[in-house]
Amino acid sequence: MLALVCSCLLLAALPADTWSGPAAVELGSDTVEQIRDTHAKVTEIWQALTQQRAAQGEPAGALHAVCRVQPSATLDAAQPRVSGLVVFRQLGPGAQLEAFFDLEGFPVEANLSSRAIHVHQFGDLSQGCDSTGAHYNPLAVQHPQHPGDFGNFAVRDGRLWKYRSGLAASLAGPHSIVGRAVVVHAGEDDLGRGGNAASVENGNAGPRLACCVVGASGPAPWARQAQEHAERKKRRRESECKAA
């Protein structure tokens, strides 16, 4: 990449007659000095960019995406209005995907409940979450082996907050989920064990409460969620120490 940038800048910087005529291969001292200056500037820029990513704790090839969850436009008045954020990070093409799920607006129930979250085929929200299509299934396999079958998430006091790693989906390559929809369902995923056709298609997860379209992003949304994750772990440890 650095060599490519250098080449482009050099082509733009050198006079036109440098590349024509019998003496095209002979560079004067001024031109050589100009090449050295350009190389030094490009190297400085590249090092600054690399150091910036390193300071953020991110490798240069890390990929990020964000999905801002909103209630489906087709919900009945009695259904809950779920909203929030899903942020993704992949340290490079071929690396495993990880995500933070931060959602609220679920009913506050006495017992812990679980809700299914899946990636659906289309990023089309023109008819709410109903127009996102079926599960994204590029390899034509049965549920729950779809790349975006994220499974069930525990809801406590009307909120869902979870970090998950090792997800099968990807932000890169021919099966990227960027531009597709994340859908939050009203029910629990039976993980293909329901004994009917719907079970191996969608896990009998029920109506679609909320959804969003996955979009590429910078590292900032991930950094904020990672900070909250670290603070939660710290509070949990402190609570355990006090209880002991």
Swiss-Prot record:
UniProt keyword Metal-binding present: yes
Domain of life: Eukaryota
GO MF annotations in UniProt: copper ion binding; superoxide dismutase activity
Xref: CDD domains: Cu-Zn_Superoxide_Dismutase
EC nos: 1.15.1.1
Cofactor remark from the record: Binds 1 copper ion per subunit.
SUPFAM superfamilies (UniProt xref): Cu,Zn superoxide dismutase-like
Glycosites: N111
Residues in coiled coil: none
Residues the record lists as binding Cu cation: H118, H120, H135, H185
Sorted UniProt keywords: Antioxidant, Copper, Disulfide bond, Glycoprotein, Golgi apparatus, Metal-binding, Oxidoreductase, Secreted, Signal, Zinc
A Pfam family per the record: Sod_Cu
Catalytic activity: 2 superoxide + 2 H(+) = H2O2 + O2
Subcellular localization: Secreted, Extracellular space; Golgi apparatus, trans-Golgi network
Residues the entry annotates as binding Zn(2+): H135, H143, H146, D149
A GO cellular component entry from the record: collagen-containing extracellular matrix
Keyword Signal found: yes
Names of required cofactors: Cu cation; Zn(2+)
Endpoints of the signal sequence: 1-18
Record's function text: Protect the extracellular space from toxic effect of reactive oxygen intermediates by converting superoxide radicals into hydrogen peroxide and oxygen.
Subunit details: Homotetramer. Directly interacts with ATP7A; this interaction is copper-dependent and is required for SOD3 activity.
Name of the featured protein: Extracellular superoxide dismutase [Cu-Zn]
Species whose genome carries this gene: Oryctolagus cuniculus (Rabbit)
Species lineage: Eukaryota, Metazoa, Chordata, Craniata, Vertebrata
Gene: SOD3
